[in-house]
């Protein structure tokens, strides 16, 4: 009875009509508020992480983020499939709630905060529902641009949030930052509940759930069905694995190992966000000038450069340079999506994009864990005083995770050089369509 009552309550909440017709702007607000709330906690989380795990800071940071990422990867297809059955609004309400659930725990108990942060990955996958919402309300021609707006909004939320969170923390303490972040996240839940209209009409919803829809590994297994897509997905894996590891560990590394203050770190994050937005906005022009394949290679070279700078740099200006190059290298994944959108037809594009997204989800789980373990093996899980008192020559073990990432990206560059060029890829649309048939029908392409 309680289960039925909860289901009825959720369906009732999801049936609230919202404001206006469903459009991309609705989910842009959701994404901005969600990551603005977490952006406020960037500096407080580093302080809390250091306080809670003083001797294993990098390892525990990697494991917490790794568990969260892996759980998100495992649950994302199920969440997407459920949104096809029950509608986008209900699942968006659930995922936004679970994404923000750990925030107030930071003032209650640090251990519970990190534990719930890790477990929240099960339902904290709002991006998958957001992209489905965007697909509902846009045409195929508008979709790529709209996805870019979602990514740019995510970056925009980080322009001022970390600096603002740090300023509030210094003036009023961590608890005040957590309170404000909680209020922002709560307002986001209320916005979804009252303002976001349903984008998927009942008449076009799925009638049931199959294991194929919920299996996170199915799309990855189907990668082997086409050599070009297999190559593309391996390239994605080689650069997204270290990118995800960096995203989870670099702020703590700069603070605890390189001596960055919270203010300086906030400024760097804001500047990187602005550069990333600019680079992604310019991607369309870059692709038109040099082509999608060369845009991928450009992004990979930039990522290789910034990883080497992090590995060999021992001065703050080198870390600033590495951060700026890292922001510019953020064009790589959108360039891969542009390659797929340009050189596959509309019917096969969704299947191939799904594979690449699945690979991205896998890297978001493995990357932080791998970097955390390599930091630990490199003897970097020390307290802040010991780290800052070590000499530069003594601490070259810090290069370990970044050199690992650089080697991975270098392999990606070698493989990316074999990606079919524009003319060859344009001639492969029938192969892309055949791949879509294999994925969806789970059988070989019929022959005449």
What are these regions (language model features)?
Residues 2-21, 197-233, 256, 432-444:
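Juxtamembrane intracellular "pre-TM" segments in multi-pass secondary transporters
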Residues 32, 102, 112-125, 317-331:
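Hydrophobic core of transmembrane alpha-helices in multi-pass small-molecule transporters
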Residues 44-58, 248-265:
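Short amphipathic helix-loop junctions that connect adjacent transmembrane helices
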Residues 45, 125-138, 331-345:
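Intracellular juxtamembrane helix-capping segments at the cytosolic ends
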Residues 74-108:
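Conserved MFS/SLC helix-loop-helix module at the cytosolic interface between two early adjacent transmembrane helices
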Residues 75-87, 279-292, 375:
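Helix-to-loop junctions at the C-terminal end of transmembrane segments
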Residues 90-104, 182, 294-309:
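Structural signature of the two symmetry-related core transmembrane helices
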Residues 116-155:
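Cytoplasmic helix-loop-helix junction between adjacent transmembrane helices
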């Amino acid at each position: 009875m309680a289960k039925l009552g909860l289901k009825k309550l959720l369906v009732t909440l999801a049936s609230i009509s919202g404001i206006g017709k469903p459009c991309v702007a609705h989910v842009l607000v959701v994404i901005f508020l969600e990551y603005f709330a977490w952006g406020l906690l960037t500096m407080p989380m580093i302080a809390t992480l250091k306080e809670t795990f003083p001797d294993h800071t990098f390892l525990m940071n990697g494991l917490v983020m790794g568990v969260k990422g892996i759980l998100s990867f495992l649950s994302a297809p199920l969440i997407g499939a459920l949104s096809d059955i029950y509608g986008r609004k209900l699942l968006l309400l659930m995922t936004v709630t679970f994404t923000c659930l750990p925030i107030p725990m930071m003032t209650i108990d640090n251990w519970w905060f990190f534990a719930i942060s890790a477990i929240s990955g099960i339902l904290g996958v709002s991006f998958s529902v957001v992209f489905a919402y965007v697909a509902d309300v846009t045409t195929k021609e508008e979709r790529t641009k709209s996805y870019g707006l979602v990514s740019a909004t995510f970056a925009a939320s980080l322009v001022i949030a970390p600096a603002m969170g740090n300023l509030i923390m210094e003036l009023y303490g961590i608890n005040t930052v957590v309170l404000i972040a909680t209020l922002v996240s709560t307002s986001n839940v209320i916005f979804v509940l009252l303002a976001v209209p349903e984008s998927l009409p009942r008449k076009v919803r799925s009638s049931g759930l199959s294991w194929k829809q919920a299996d996170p590994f199915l799309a990855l297994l189907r990668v082997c069905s086409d050599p070009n897509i297999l190559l593309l997905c391996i390239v994605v894996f080689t650069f997204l694995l270290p990118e995800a590891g960096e995203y989870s560990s670099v702020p703590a590394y700069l603070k605890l190992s390189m001596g960055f203050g919270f203010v300086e770190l906030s400024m760097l994050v804001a500047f990187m966000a602005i550069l990333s937005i600019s680079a992604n906005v310019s991607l369309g022009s870059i692709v038109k000038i040099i082509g999608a394949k060369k845009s991928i290679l450009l992004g990979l070279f930039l990522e290789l450069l910034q990883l080497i700078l992090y590995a060999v740099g021992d001065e703050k200006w080198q870390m600033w340079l590495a951060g700026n190059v890292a922001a510019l290298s953020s064009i790589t994944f959108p360039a891969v999506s542009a390659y797929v959108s340009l050189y596959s037809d509309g019917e096969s594009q969704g299947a191939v994009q799904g594979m690449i997204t699945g690979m991205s989800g896998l890297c978001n789980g493995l990357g932080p864990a791998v970097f955390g373990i390599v930091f630990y093996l490199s003897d970097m899980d020390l307290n802040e005083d010991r780290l800052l008192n070590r000499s530069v020559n003594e601490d070259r073990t810090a290069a370990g995770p970044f050199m690992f990432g650089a080697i991975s990206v270098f392999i990606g560059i070698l493989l990316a050089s074999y990606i079919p060029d524009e003319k060859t890829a344009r001639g492969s649309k029938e192969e892309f369509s055949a791949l879509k048939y294999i994925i969806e029908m789970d059988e070989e392409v019929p022959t005449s």
